[in-house]
Regions:
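Thr-Gly-centered strand-to-loop micro-motif
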Residues: 56, 85-86, 123, 129-130, ...
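Short, basic, glycine/proline-bearing loop/turn elements
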Residues: 57-59, 87-97
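C-terminal cap of metal-dependent C-N hydrolases
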Residues: 158, 178-219
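Short, ordered loop/turn segments at secondary-structure junctions
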Residues: 27-28, 88-89, 125-127
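Short, well-ordered secondary-structure micro-motifs
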Residues: 34, 65-68, 95-97, 132-135, ...
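Surface-exposed, flexible loop/turn segments at secondary-structure boundaries
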Residues: 61-63, 91, 128, 192-193, ...
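Histidine/acidic residue-rich metal-binding segments in metalloenzymes
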Residues: 1-54, 60-82, 99-122
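His/Asp/Glu-enriched, well-ordered alpha-helical/loop segment
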Residues: 42-53, 93, 104-189
Length: 219
């Protein structure tokens, strides 16, 4: 889009004026020249909107030169931009060529982003639709797939499906502690490995200490 810079700046001007938060689906492709994420990072800094801008996908970061990626990641951390990686969607759609085994994963560099201080979220944006019929909103299943695809240590990335998404939406999430609100999901299993090995295991959802639902896919 030849007018992308102008349009993005207009969006930021309105968001800053009306104190809105912004969410972008950006650079969802494997073209190395795709760099709208960079512009969003610059505008976030320019309009002092740290903590109010969330981007999704940024698949092109996986194929751009390493030095470019390092620079934009550092700038994103300084600007306060968060990034959602959509592992199942990106793995399915990127480098998807009929009859050819994919060689590119299309996943944004999660380890590097996190190491630089960029809040990383995990999510899914294609659920039982023509783009990805096997998609699910189940956050635990998303974490499981991301752990396999990006070699994550699952227990260390729990914030990617809990606190980081909450903060990106401007919400607080209570910790489990004495005197805190007893809002949590109890998953059947003896360890993280059990929970991820059987993502459809029985769950119980608690709100203020009371059971809200019991089932294999409680939400």
């Amino acid at each position: 889009n030849k007018n992308l810079d102008v349009l993005l700046e207009q969006v930021f001007k309105h968001a800053a004026h009306y104190e809105l938060m912004l969410d972008f689906h950006v650079d969802e492709g494997l073209e190395p020249e795709a760099a709208a994420f960079d512009r969003i990072v610059d505008l976030t800094h320019q309009f002092s909107m740290a903590g109010r801008v969330l981007c999704g996908h940024a698949c092109s970061l996986s194929v751009r030169p390493t030095d470019e990626v390092s620079r934009v990641i550092s700038k994103a951390a300084d600007a306060g931009v968060a990034l959602t990686v959509l592992p199942t969607t990106n793995l399915w759609l990127q480098d998807n060529q009929n009859g050819t085994t994919p060689r590119l994963r299309g996943l944004a560099p999660m380890h590097e982003l996190r190491a630089a201080g960029v809040p990383v979220l995990l999510g899914a944006d294609n659920v039982a639709d023509p783009f990805f019929s096997m998609g699910t909103y189940d956050a635990l299943d998303v974490l499981r797939n991301a752990s396999i695809a990006a070699h994550l240590a699952p227990a260390d990335w729990l914030d990617s499906i809990t606190t980081n998404p909450a903060r990106a939406m401007g919400r607080d999430i209570n910790e489990i502690k004495i005197g805190g609100s007893a809002d949590f999901i109890l998953i059947e299993g003896n360890s993280w490995e059990d929970a991820l090995r059987s993502p459809k295991a029985s769950r119980q959802v608690f709100r203020a200490g009371r059971t809200q639902s019991i089932g294999k896919e409680a939400a």
